[in-house]
Every structure is written in structure tokens, then in C-alpha cells.
């Protein structure tokens, strides 16, 4: 086996272990934020939405800067620094009793993510061969789902005792992850050339096809981020207990572990990437529309199940498209900018979703936020269809297995 092949194989295992630690650390804390501050402390949902939206926008919106810096200086220092910064954010969150302190903790958490997320994504593109990326992204997403359930279960159990224990556990996991990277991650370059920060950013911004694709996905992310805000609140409201939230993540894990990889393997040779992305988005949009009208957990979990199936269909295609469009001369910059749609959509989804949720309660129209999200999903579906027309998008990007 050549040294390059050996490095790729070892790199796969490193990426999987690293991803599991990051997912566990994140999901121990973040799914419980809305329950802690809205249901337990009585804050308005929009206040928590601002905090979550701020974290999302800082992490993803500034990702191009984190990626460009990683292109210049390498992945390792950015990843280690970012993970320690997120640990500090979680520690601060544990003592947050005023909105400004929660916002500051989410700012720290997001800034840490800005530093470590783009280089981690670029390492996947660097270490995984193009023909294997779709399946590897599916494995990562299966791992994300399992880690989400384990993290949410652990966080829900700790929340019975003290929210500070929840935050301390998340912080410890990110400190462990920082040590793991500091010890084992080689000083790899992300790009084929050591690209200056400004040059990497310029290269991305001049790629109109990539920019359009990323910005169009903002509507997709407005729906996707509700698993952290409105869906946990809805489950808690109907069940009357935050313990029921763990079953929401259990549903996601079961569906992902049983369906994600088989669907990706089966569909990659039969359907074009844009068809898979759009089909998943359509299912997600349809499942959102009736959520505000359900009256029991069985109905709600059925719709959540449909939402997750849509995500299982869409996510591998979305990640593969983003990776396939990245210029090898500026991988970090491209993968950082690819998060901008999540920054915009996530911020609007959290803040706007929280505001609509409060408004729906005030007007006695609980279906209002869910109807709006469904409509946004349909608009995004049409926008993607327009973008993916043959007149606008090169065929190579869309072929099965691309």
C-alpha cells in the first residue's frame, strides 16, 4: 500500500472519531437550550431564537474567513483553537441567567465553529476520493444521528439535576476533541497550493455558479434548523415533559442508521444529485405544513418521521454537490463559503421561527409558523429547479455518482 493510500485510510478513521466527539459535545447541549430557557425559565422563544441564530450566523457566515485562514496556515491550529473556544462558550452558557450572557456564550460557540468547521470539511474533501465522498458523507450523517441521540439522552438526563452539568459535559467533550486533534492530526495543508487569504476568498466570490447554489440553500436550512428550536418546543408542549425530546432524536437515529446509507447507495446510480436534493426538500416542506394542527405525540412523531426521511434523501446529495464544486486550489475557502446558506437560513429560521412561534401563540394560531416554513420550502424547491436547469448548470455537476 502506498503512503498516500495509507494516509487516506488512517485519515478516514481519524475523521470518524473526531466527528463523533464533536457531535456528542454539540448535542449534549444545543437541543436542550430551548427547553431550558423557554420552558424552564419562561423566556420568550424569540430571545432564544436570537441566541441560536447568532451562533449559526457567526459560525457559518464567517466560515469563508476561517476557511481562507486555514488555507494559509493549515488545519491543525485552527481546529484546536476553535474547539477550545467552543468549550469556553459552553462553560459561559452554564451560568447564563440574562439574555445577553446567553447571546455571548453562543457568540463564543459560533466563533469557535468558524475556526474548526471549514478545515474539518476540507479535510474530508482532501482525504476522501471523489467517487467515495457520497457514501462517506452518508456514514458521517449516520454517525451524526447516532451521536445526536446519545448526546440528547445524556443531556436530558443531566438536565434533571442541573443545566450547568449539561454545559460542563459539552465543554469537556470539546476539550477532549481539541487534545485529540493536537496529538494526532498531522500538519496537513488543505489546498494544493498555499493560497493567500485574500486570493482564496476572491476565487470563491468569482465563482457565480457556486455562490448562487449556496445562497439558494438558505431556504432549505430555514426548515432544517427547526430540529433545534421549534420541534423540541412542540414535543415538550404536547408531551408535558422535556424527556420526550429524546424520542425525537431516537426517531432520527433509527431512520438514519437504517435508511441513509442504503438510500445513498441505491440512488447515486439511478438519480441525478439535484433530483435527490429537491425530492428530499419537497418531503420536508410537505411534512412541515400540518405540524401546527396536531394534537398528540403520535401525529407529531409521524410528521417528524416524514421530515427526517426528507432530510435523509437530501443531505448526502447536498454535501456531495458542495464538495464536487470546490476548487482544489482553495478548498478551505470553498467549504467555508458553502456554509453561508446555513448562516443566512439558520439565522432567519431561528429568529424568524421564534418570532412566528410567539406570534402564533399570541394570536391563537399555532399553525402559523409551520405554514410559513412549508411555503418557504416550496419557494426554495422552485428556485433550485430553476438553478439546476440544463441551460444554467453543467451536466457534470448533476450526473449520478458525480
From Swiss-Prot:
Source organism, top-level taxon: Bacteria
Primary site of residence: membrane
Topology Periplasmic: residue spans: 34-98, 160-164, 235-243, 298-299, 361-367
Signal peptide positions on this chain: none
Matching CDD domains: MFS_MdtH_MDR_like (cd17329)
Keyword Transmembrane annotated: yes
Topology of this chain in the membrane: Multi-pass membrane protein
GO MF: transmembrane transporter activity
Membrane-spanning ranges: 13-33, 99-116, 139-159, 165-185, 214-234, 244-264, 277-297, 300-320, 340-360, 368-388
Cytoplasmic-facing ranges: 1-12, 117-138, 186-213, 265-276, 321-339, 389-402
SUPFAM superfamilies associated with the record: MFS general substrate transporter (SSF103473)
Cellular component, GO, one term: plasma membrane
Keywords carried by this UniProt record: Cell inner membrane, Cell membrane, Membrane, Transmembrane, Transmembrane helix, Transport
Intracellular or extracellular location(s): Cell inner membrane
NCBIfam families with a match to the protein in the record: PRK11646.1 (NF008650)
UniProt-listed HAMAP family: MFS_MdtH
Family membership: Belongs to the major facilitator superfamily. DHA1 family. MdtH (TC 2.A.1.2.21) subfamily.
PANTHER family referenced in this protein's UniProt entry, alphabetically: MULTIDRUG RESISTANCE PROTEIN MDTH, RESISTANCE PROTEIN MDTM, PUTATIVE-RELATED-RELATED
Protein name, per record: Multidrug resistance protein MdtH
Protein source organism: Salmonella newport (strain SL254)
Encoding gene (name): mdtH
Amino acid at each position: 500500500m502506498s503512503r498516500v493510500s495509507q494516509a487516506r485510510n488512517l485519515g478516514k478513521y481519524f475523521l470518524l472519531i473526531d466527528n463523533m466527539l464533536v457531535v456528542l459535545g454539540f448535542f449534549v447541549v444545543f437541543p436542550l437550550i430551548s427547553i431550558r430557557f423557554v420552558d424552564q425559565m419562561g423566556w420568550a422563544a424569540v430571545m432564544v431564537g436570537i441566541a441560536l441564530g447568532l451562533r449559526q450566523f457567526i459560525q457559518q457566515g464567517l466560515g469563508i474567513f476561517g476557511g481562507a485562514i486555514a488555507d494559509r496556515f493549515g488545519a491543525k491550529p485552527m481546529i484546536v483553537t476553535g474547539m477550545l473556544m467552543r468549550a469556553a462558550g459552553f462553560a459561559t452558557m452554564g451560568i447564563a441567567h440574562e439574555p445577553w450572557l446567553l447571546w455571548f456564550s453562543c457568540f463564543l460557540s459560533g466563533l469557535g465553529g468558524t475556526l474548526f468547521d471549514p478545515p474539518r470539511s476540507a479535510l474530508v474533501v482532501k482525504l476522501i476520493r471523489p467517487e467515495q465522498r457520497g457514501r462517506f458523507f452518508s456514514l458521517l450523517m449516520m454517525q451524526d444521528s447516532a451521536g445526536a441521540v446519545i448526546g440528547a439522552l445524556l443531556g436530558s438526563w443531566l438536565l434533571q439535576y442541573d443545566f450547568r452539568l449539561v454545559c460542563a459535559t459539552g465543554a469537556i467533550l470539546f476539550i477532549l476533541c481539541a487534545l485529540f486533534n493536537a496529538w494526532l492530526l498531522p500538519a496537513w495543508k488543505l489546498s494544493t497550493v498555499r493560497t493567500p487569504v485574500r486570493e482564496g476568498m476572491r476565487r470563491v466570490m468569482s465563482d457565480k455558479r457556486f455562490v448562487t447554489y449556496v445562497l439558494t440553500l438558505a431556504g432549505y436550512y430555514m426548515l432544517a434548523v427547526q430540529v433545534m428550536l421549534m420541534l423540541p418546543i412542540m414535543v415538550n408542549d404536547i408531551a408535558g415533559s422535556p424527556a420526550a425530546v429524546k424520542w425525537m432524536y431516537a426517531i432520527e437515529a433509527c431512520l438514519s442508521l437504517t435508511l441513509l446509507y442504503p438510500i445513498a447507495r441505491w440512488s447515486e446510480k439511478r438519480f441525478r444529485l439535484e433530483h435527490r436534493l429537491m425530492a428530499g426538500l419537497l418531503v420536508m416542506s410537505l411534512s412541515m405544513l400540518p405540524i401546527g394542527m396536531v394534537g398528540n405525540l403520535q401525529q407529531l412523531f409521524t410528521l417528524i418521521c416524514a421530515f427526517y426521511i426528507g432530510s435523509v434523501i437530501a443531505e448526502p446529495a447536498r454535501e456531495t454537490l458542495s464538495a464536487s464544486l470546490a476548487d482544489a486550489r482553495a478548498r478551505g475557502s470553498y467549504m467555508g463559503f458553502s456554509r453561508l446558506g446555513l448562516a443566512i437560513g439558520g439565522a432567519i429560521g431561528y429568529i424568524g421561527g421564534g418570532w412566528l412561534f410567539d406570534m402564533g401563540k399570541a394570536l391563537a394560531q399555532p399553525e402559523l409558523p409551520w405554514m410559513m416554513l412549508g411555503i418557504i420550502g416550496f419557494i426554495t424547491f422552485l428556485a433550485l429547479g430553476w438553478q439546476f436547469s440544463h441551460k444554467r448548470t453543467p451536466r457534470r455537476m448533476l450526473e449520478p455518482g458525480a
